[in-house]
């Protein structure tokens, strides 16, 4: 099968970046970049660019980790979206580049450690309590949502810089409700 011109451009990009001589974490965010690092392309990157050691997977497709592990077993997978942490942890992950731990660091790290140690029975209800909130990390308003979550718990998130505008009042209220729900879970468990 022939590779697409875009795939060749992606390979050329990583080869150029690799000239710096340090390990590279590829970032798959097809929503914002309009370039999808498919498992087949990740396999090709793994074969042709040894400096790429990991991928931050933000496609939202939880099936991909299994394909990446099969096609590019040397590439470590890092969770790139908060709302797929538990699903990807079932396949074994190497890390989590996350948003909402800025607002809820202790709770998020507890969840991460339970999930990565395979303690899914304890992790599942915790994840359920956080999931609606975590889903904001996969929306275009994620920066505003995380900052608002930080403000909610007394960690200064502050206003966003332009071009990001404050969230509409109904979305702010929703985030406050979701923060309250998550905090109540941790307080009452």
What are these regions (language model features)?
Residues 29:
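Conserved C-terminal portion of the radical SAM core fold
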Residues 7-15, 38-42:
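Charged helix-capping and loop-helix junction motifs
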Residues 1-3:
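Short, small-residue-biased leader/transition segments that mark boundaries at the very start
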Residues 20-22, 32-140:
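Catalytic alpha/beta core domains of metabolic enzymes, predominantly
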Residues 155-189:
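Flexible C-terminal active-site loop/helix
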Residues 89-92, 131-164:
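Conserved short secondary-structure transition element at the edge of the structured enzyme core
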Residues 11-26:
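Alpha-helix-loop-beta-strand connector modules within alpha/beta enzyme cores
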């Amino acid at each position: 099968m022939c590779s697409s011109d875009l795939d060749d451009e992606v390979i050329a990009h990583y080869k150029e970046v690799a000239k710096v001589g340090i390990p590279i974490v590829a970032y798959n965010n097809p929503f914002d970049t309009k370039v999808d690092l498919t498992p087949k392309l990740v396999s090709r990157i793994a074969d042709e660019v040894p400096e790429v050691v990991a991928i931050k997977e933000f496609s939202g497709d939880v099936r991909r980790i299994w394909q990446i592990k099969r096609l590019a077993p040397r590439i470590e997978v890092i969770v790139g979206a908060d709302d797929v942490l538990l699903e990807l942890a079932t396949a074994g992950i190497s890390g989590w580049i996350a948003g909402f731990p800025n607002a809820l660091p202790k709770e998020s790290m507890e969840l991460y450690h339970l999930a990565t140690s395979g303690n899914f029975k304890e992790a599942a209800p915790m994840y359920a309590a956080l999931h609606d909130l975590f889903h904001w990390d996969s929306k275009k308003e994620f920066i505003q949502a995380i900052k608002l979550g930080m403000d909610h718990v007394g960690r200064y998130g502050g206003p966003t810089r332009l071009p990001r505008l404050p969230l509409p009042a109904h979305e702010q209220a929703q985030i406050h409700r979701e923060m309250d729900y998550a905090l109540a879970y941790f307080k009452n468990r």
